[in-house]
Amino acid sequence: MTKLYRIEGTFRYEGEKYECDVHSYGTLEVCKIPGAPEECDVDLEYVETENCIEWDEELEDWHRIEACDLPEDVVEKIEGEALERLRVGDYKEVCLIGTKE
C-alpha cells in the first residue's frame, strides 16, 4: 500500500507567518505560498514539524501521528535532504514536505 505523509503546520516566509496550504503535484506534496512562484522556489525560514499527519486509505482522510519519525525508506526516496533536515531540526531552504512513494 502506498503511504503518503506530509508535515502540516505553520511556517515563516520573509518575516510573515503563513498556514501551510498544501497542494499535490504528482508524487510530491509542496507548500503553496501566497504570491510565490508556481515552482515554489522560495526560502522557508521556519517550519514546525510537530504536526505530522499520515493518509489513511481506509478512512480516506488524514490522521495525526505522534511523531515525524518517517521510515528510512520513505526518507531515502525524497529528493535532496529537505525532509531529513526537517526531521533533525536543521531548517534550510526547503519546499518539499512529503512524499507518496
Task: Please identify what each model-predicted range represents.
Residues 31-101:
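Acidic, low-complexity intrinsically disordered segments
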Residues 1-34:
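Short, charged/polar N-terminal "headpieces" of proteins
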